[in-house]
């Protein structure tokens, strides 16, 4: 119950910020594409973007099969606080900021980018969870068989960017909520483990 309430609070903070504020620019003004390749095979941490978990190790997402090519020299390098999205799955939420690892590589099909100095990545991450972003993104999907969002389409999406102090304040509020959610999930996990342990003891 508490976890759901915290998630709703996070959503409310995000929606209030973007619903009440008029766009003062487009995403292309605040982001830049990153397409550095893993030419020398320097990195082997192959990642995917999940619509629920963000960046995850590809080996964990597809445990029953190998998805990555043996030759990853054409894979794109993503660094901490970079963003990536699957053009064909962004409509179901497959866009994320890299926070779990310092660096990794993703399939060439992913679009990768980073924020410019005028915006903090936490604020941009919040925007990507807003209804405003979803509405504007859906209007820019293209394709006859599979709908995709190009980088150009992403750059054309209008966005409200406040001054740095407001960005930081919003980022801190959301980070605090996410931290509390993480602690509650960890606590529930421990309770479940304890329950399983006690049940096993009862039937020994």
Predicted regions and their residues:
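DNA target-recognition domains and sequence-specific DNA-contacting regions of bacterial/archaeal
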Residues: 28-161
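Juxtamembrane/interface motifs at transmembrane-helix termini
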Residues: 4-8, 19, 48-49, 62, ...
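Short, well-ordered alpha-helical packing segments
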Residues: 3, 7, 28-31, 110, ...
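Generic recognition of stable, solvent-exposed alpha-helical segments in well-folded globular domains
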Residues: 1, 8, 73, 79, ...
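Charge-rich, acidic-biased intrinsically disordered regions
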Residues: 25-29, 57, 198-204
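Non-catalytic DNA-recognition/assembly elements of restriction-modification systems
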Residues: 5-40, 156, 160, 166
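A structural feature that tracks compact, well-ordered secondary-structure segments
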Residues: 1-5, 14-17, 159-162, 168-190, ...
